């Protein structure tokens, strides 16, 4: 059940290996459980060929290690600031822009956080490293802009 009170912003730490979502409620700082009772979600997507669907986090790793046919994609954050972000990759037999791949994962973080918190998050604070790309201010700014664009595309207003 969704809360009737106004939504507050969440904070997303989109990490290379793991991601977390936090929520500041009045007087309470909370890291939100994203997978079972765990506050981290491995930054992994597995596209299961048999079931023609993406799975995320520990389940993605499990299905991959169990030998399901598909494609495992890790370290998604490393796409930010790279030239690959402007290209497509093959997923379940079709071309998918890498930017859309990032959107799938970040949308999953948003969806899981909202389900656990019982409310929608319309605003987000996106964590970022000091530099997405060392010694290249333009690529670093492009990485930040891409992350912001992805957040807006999946429904964050600010």
Where are these regions (language model features)?
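Phosphate-binding loop and its immediate beta->loop->alpha context
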Residues: 27-157
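Charged, flexible boundary elements
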Residues: 1, 157-158
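Gly/Thr-rich phosphate-binding beta-strand-loop-beta motif of the actin/hexokinase/Hsp70
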Residues: 2-31
């Amino acid at each position: 059940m969704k809360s009737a009170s106004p939504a507050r912003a969440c904070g997303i730490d989109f990490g290379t290996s793991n991601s977390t979502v936090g929520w500041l409620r009045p007087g309470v700082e909370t890291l939100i459980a994203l997978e079972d009772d765990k506050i981290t979600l491995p930054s992994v997507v597995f596209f299961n060929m048999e079931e023609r669907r993406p799975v995320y986090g520990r389940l993605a790793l499990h299905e991959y290690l169990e030998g399901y046919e598909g494609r495992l994609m890790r370290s998604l954050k490393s796409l930010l600031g790279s030239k690959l972000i402007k290209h497509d990759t093959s997923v379940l037999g079709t071309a998918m822009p890498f930017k859309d791949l990032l959107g799938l994962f970040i949308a999953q973080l948003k969806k899981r956080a909202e389900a656990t918190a019982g409310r929608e998050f319309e605003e987000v604070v996106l964590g970022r490293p000091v530099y997405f790309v060392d010694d290249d201010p333009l690529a670093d700014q492009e990485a930040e802009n891409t992350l912001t664009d992805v957040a807006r595309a999946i429904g964050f207003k600010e």
